[in-house]
Structure formats: structure tokens, C-alpha cells
Regions:
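Loop/turn-to-beta-strand initiation segments
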Residues: 27, 68-71, 90-92, 116-120, ...
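Post-DEXD/H (motif II) to motif III coupling segment of the RecA-like Helicase ATP-binding lobe
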Residues: 99-162
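Conserved helix/coil segment N-terminal to the catalytic DExD/H
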Residues: 61-92, 103-108
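Conserved Walker A/P-loop ATP-binding site and its immediately adjacent core
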Residues: 8-47, 212-216
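Conserved RecA-like helicase motor-core motifs
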Residues: 42, 49-64, 207
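Conserved pre-motif I regulatory segment
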Residues: 1-3
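Conserved interdomain hinge at the start of the Helicase C-terminal
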Residues: 18, 174-214
Length: 216
């Protein structure tokens, strides 16, 4: 299980593993959490100069499950209910963004891959719970940190960050539901004015991210 943050080259690491095991005549199952990542991984392989169309088969949204291609790129949702026999030909399994897999589904897939001697999990982060770490290490093996975000910043691969957390204090109030409390916060005039003024006072370009678009 390789823990490596954003912009650390996870796609290139995965590509290198795939090319290595394809050259060794192995059949590879590459599992990702979303449909968009299936296409992104396929495109990354093409961008690295590989003839992905000749070597890779994509599975998602009801696509054909069976293929003779040496590499299958799929979402975990597309395969976790398949019979054990479907998994028998795979010698290598690679899980990208492994922290986003549901534990039961991941275990279901990995236990069916009893012929997969080589198992690699990639993630930028763990969710902070020891149980989740144990589940991932149980199916992929021991975890190793490839690098850290601060190291990438020192090396100039990532932008230098200055993170400041601002906490706005409100008078204590009681709400019947969680949604009532959220509604109070996002419609609070002074709070929104503070965010507005802060945004306008900052130099350069500013990106403001928020949830509940309609409410704002």
C-alpha cells in the first residue's frame, strides 16, 4: 500500500507497474473508484506514449466485462458482484485511490483474486481511522509513504502554501435540526459580509469554494 500525495506521480508509478507486468506476460486488473478515473487513467497511459487501445479494456456503466486484453481498467462497482471465476485469470491487481473503496466491496474483490500474487494499492491519504488502515493493509500489504506534500513543496514541485484557518464565533443558539443550524449559518448576514470583504481585499486572483450553491 503506497501512500503518496497529489502531484507525486501516482499515475506514472501505476503506468510503470502496468508496463513491467505486461512485459512479463501477466494479466492486470486496475481498479479505480469512479468512471471518470477509468477514462483519466486510460488517457494518462496514452499521454505516456503507450498504445492503450491495443492493451487496455475499460469496464464501467454496463460495458462488456470479458476481454482478452492484458490490462483491464474498471470501477470497483462494476465488478464486486461478479463470480469468482471471472477473477481467476488475473495475476496482478492495482487499486488506485484505495481509500475511496467501500471496505466490504474491496474485501469481496480481493478475496476473489486468489491467483493475484502481486497486489498494489495507491492512495493520497487514509481516512484517519486505524480500522480503515487495517482493512487496506489486510488486502494490499504493509503501507509505505512514498513522499510528503511538504517535501514536494521544498523541491518546487508544488506551490508554497500558507494556510490560515479563520473561526467565526456566533452567539450560542439551539436548533431543532442540523439543517436548521446550517441554514442559520449560511444566511447569516455578518458572516457572508465578512467572507465578501475578505475576498475583495485579497491581492491577485481568488477562488471561493462553497457547498449549497442554491442557498448562497
Amino acid at each position: 500500500l503506497l501512500i503518496s500525495p497529489t502531484a507525486s506521480g501516482k499515475s506514472l508509478m501505476i503506468y510503470s507497474l502496468v508496463r513491467y507486468y505486461v512485459d512479463k506476460g501477466q494479466k492486470i486488473l486496475l481498479v479505480v473508484p469512479t468512471t471518470s478515473l477509468v477514462e483519466q487513467m486510460y488517457k494518462d497511459f496514452e499521454d505516456y506514449g503507450w498504445d492503450a487501445e491495443s492493451y487496455c479494456h475499460k469496464i464501467y456503466s454496463g460495458r462488456e466485462k470479458d476481454s482478452s486484453a492484458p490490462v483491464t481498467i474498471t470501477t470497483w462497482q462494476s465488478i464486486y458482484k461478479l463470480e469468482r471465476s471471472w477473477f481467476e485469470d488475473y495475476n496482478v491487481v492495482i487499486g488506485d485511490e484505495a481509500h475511496l473503496f467501500k471496505s466490504k466491496s474491496l474485501i469481496s474483490i480481493m478475496t476473489k483474486l486468489h491467483h493475484a500474487k502481486y497486489r498494489f494499492g495507491f492512495t493520497g491519504t487514509l481516512d484517519g481511522t486505524q480500522t480503515h488502515k487495517w482493512v487496506l493493509e489486510g488486502v494490499f500489504g504493509p503501507s509505505y509513504k512514498v513522499t510528503r506534500t511538504d517535501e514536494l513543496m521544498k523541491q518546487g514541485h508544488l506551490s508554497q502554501l500558507d494556510i490560515q484557518c479563520l473561526v467565526l464565533k456566533h452567539k450560542p443558539q439551539t436548533f431543532e435540526t442540523y439543517n436548521d443550524e446550517i441554514e442559520y449559518l449560511i444566511s447569516h448576514e455578518q458572516r457572508n459580509k465578512f467572507i465578501q470583504n475578505l475576498t475583495l481585499d485579497l491581492k491577485g486572483n481568488t477562488l471561493v469554494l462553497f457547498a449549497r450553491v442554491e442557498a448562497h
